[in-house]
Amino acid sequence: MRSPVLIINCKNYEEAAGGRIRGLADAAAGAAARYGVRIAIAPPQHLLGIIAGRDLGVLAQHVDDKGTGSTTGYVVPELLKQSGVSGAIINHSEHRVPADQVAGLVPRLRGLGMVSVVCVRDPAEAADLSRYCPDYIAIEPPELIGSGRSVSTERPQVIQEAAEAIRGAGGVKLLCGAGITSGADVRRALELGSEGILVASGVVKSADPAGAIGELARAMS
């Protein structure tokens, strides 16, 4: 995915359930075309097939370092690829995995031509996990996730320190998330060194999700 990028994590919010995910995906695709910004959406896992294959990045919210075959219940990269999914979020604060799984998953996704977005809690973890050279490192201080208090205003130094921490990591790009709700939050994050945004409740639980997507995308254009 080219920069800048906006990733919308729908988590397991009821606002993204059933057919409502199509409305979010349509709004995201429209904003991407209007503002020339790359947008990806991570729907609830069981809804991946509904929007996969659209002219829109589609990410799994989690992926397992397991193989195809007799691996009941696991989310397998190769089957995601065959279903039109373009990449995966790894190590989200709500679904943490050991570093050795990150080490296995990042090259596996790369080998399939898929995007890896590795979430970290702080600059130290950014430095540690960037050695596996994912496409993106997403810095999200857990205390700000879903708070409505933006990392770019509450903890701006975290973005700057994370950008510095991954500087020598072979083209890894920095995203930031946690509390992003407005175009002003986005602009500030980009000024601080982020190359994109990972957002969840600020869009999905908004009274006007399409309007929220448009505001964030416009700030990145």
Swiss-Prot record:
The keyword Ubl conjugation does not apply. One of its GO terms (molecular function) is triose-phosphate isomerase activity. Keywords: Cytoplasm, Gluconeogenesis, Glycolysis, Isomerase. It catalyses: D-glyceraldehyde 3-phosphate = dihydroxyacetone phosphate. SUPFAM superfamilies: Triosephosphate isomerase (TIM). Its EC number is 5.3.1.1. Pathway: Carbohydrate biosynthesis; gluconeogenesis; Carbohydrate degradation; glycolysis; D-glyceraldehyde 3-phosphate from glycerone phosphate: step 1/1. The active site is at H92 (electrophile), E140 (proton acceptor). The keyword Isomerase applies. Pfam families: TIM. Transmembrane segments: none annotated. It comes from the Archaea. Coiled coil: none annotated. It is found in: Cytoplasm. InterPro entries: Aldolase_TIM, TIM_sf, Triosephosphate_isomerase, Triosephosphate_isomerase_arc. GO terms for cellular component: cytoplasm. HAMAP family: TIM_A (MF_00147_A). Belongs to the triosephosphate isomerase family. Involved in the gluconeogenesis. Catalyzes stereospecifically the conversion of dihydroxyacetone phosphate (DHAP) to D-glyceraldehyde-3-phosphate (G3P). Homotetramer; dimer of dimers. This is Triosephosphate isomerase. It comes from Cenarchaeum symbiosum. The gene is tpiA.
